[in-house]
Curated annotation (Swiss-Prot):
GO MF, any single term: mRNA (2'-O-methyladenosine-N6-)-methyltransferase activity
Enzyme Commission identifier(s): 2.1.1.-
One Pfam family named in its UniProt record: RrnaAD
Species name: Arabidopsis thaliana (Mouse-ear cress)
Cellular localisation: Plastid, Chloroplast
Protein name: Ribosomal RNA small subunit methyltransferase, chloroplastic
Taxonomy of the source species: Eukaryota, Viridiplantae, Streptophyta, Embryophyta, Tracheophyta
Length: 343
């Protein structure tokens, strides 16, 4: 990919739409001041980019101002200011004509616009009612967009998607699995990953913009480190994860304290999941193992079987009797679970 240098731009009252007011104490003045400060700090930001797009920080400002809105920390809202990142998100998911895409937290609709322009039909889930109204108005003339006002981590997304895909297949029998593309609210990233990855019968790819530190913990944890956790076993059980690229924090408003990153999860179809006798029991074993992370498995799994029996199972699985959970790969846990399940 080509590297480009994005330079800061000057924003002044004359460049804004008539709806903007710049009185000393107006909300718009405060919003403009914070955006200008954020942009002045990003003198040079290197990103891989394609063509330019007008749906950038200007439209983000105007959209927020039109609603008198300010990003809410409680909702993890950080709006994208660089339209090229939206293009790259869509590219990472290989979005094309006829795709069905789920977007979580559409915000002002800048990423949504890219997806629709590529020919995708978009279902957006948005918790903030003001943003629901904004994107509903923005895409009112499109038959490729629907937004639901719901808290994603509490909504029945599987039911929504199964109903939608069933209807689509009546008119498009050969339609592919859906995709997820989202600039995710940072405060729900782990919950979203846990919800989406087991849906390989619905989604083929999940492409998310996450905090960089979280992305590295989820995708590239090292064995025998404190970063290696049960969620890493879950991720590799249900998907093939890939860290795509880092997104500097200067590309967001408000500017977060950390950089972000784009991550792709290529979901496995259920028929390709690791062969375990019971998925529920498998993850119960994994979670139990990590509850005593620094303990040997023969101690942390005592509620499942006696220490001598756990040691025996470890031996049959080809693992040392002194094994600890952070030392086991997904395949190791699968072998251990299946040995214990047979006994």
């Amino acid at each position: 990919m080509m590297n480009a240098v994005i330079t800061s731009a000057t924003i002044n009252c004359n460049s804004l739409s008539p709806s903007w007011t710049c009185g000393d104490n107006s909300p718009s003045k405060l919003l403009l001041g914070e955006i200008s400060a954020a942009l002045s700090r990003r003198r040079t930001v290197k990103v891989s980019c394609g063509k330019s797009s007008p749906d950038d920080y200007h439209s983000t400002l105007k959209s927020l101002n039109s609603r008198g809105r300010f990003p809410r920390k409680s909702l993890g809202q950080h709006y994208m200011l660089n339209s090229d990142i939206n293009d790259q998100l869509a590219s990472a998911a290989d979005v094309k004509e006829g795709d069905f895409v789920l977007e979580i937290g559409p915000g002002t609709g800048s990423l949504t616009n890219v997806l629709i322009n590529l020919g995708a039909t978009v279902l957006a889930i948005e918790k903030d009612p003001h943003m629901v109204d904004l994107v509903s108005e923005r895409f009112a003339g499109s038959d490729k967009f629907k937004v639901l006002q719901e808290d994603f981590v509490k909504c029945h997304i599987r039911s929504h998607m199964l109903s939608i895909l069933e209807t689509r297949r009546l008119s498009h029998p050969d339609s592919a699995l859906a995709k997820v593309v989202s600039n995710l609210p940072f405060n729900i990233s782990t919950d979203v990953v846990k919800l989406l990855l087991p849906m390989g019968d619905i989604f083929s790819k999940v492409v998310l913009l996450l905090q960089d530190e979280a992305a590295l913990r989820l995708v590239e944890p090292a064995l025998r480190t404190s970063e290696y956790r049960p969620i890493n076993i879950l991720i590799n059980f249900y998907s093939e994860p890939e860290y795509n690229f880092r997104v500097p924090r200067e590309n967001f408003f408000p500017q977060p304290k950390v950089d972000a990153a784009v991550v792709t999860f290529k979901l496995k179809h259920p028929r390709d999941y690791p062969d375990v006798s019971s998925t529920k029991n498998f993850f119960s074993l994994v979670n139990s193992a990590f509850n005593g992370k620094r303990k040997m498995l023969r101690k942390s799994l005592q509620h499942i079987s006696s220490s001598p029996d756990i040691e025996k199972a470890l031996g049959v699985a080809g693992l040392p009797a002194t094994s600890r959970p952070e030392e086991l790969t997904l395949d190791d846990f699968v072998k251990l679970h299946n040995v214990i399940a047979r006994e």
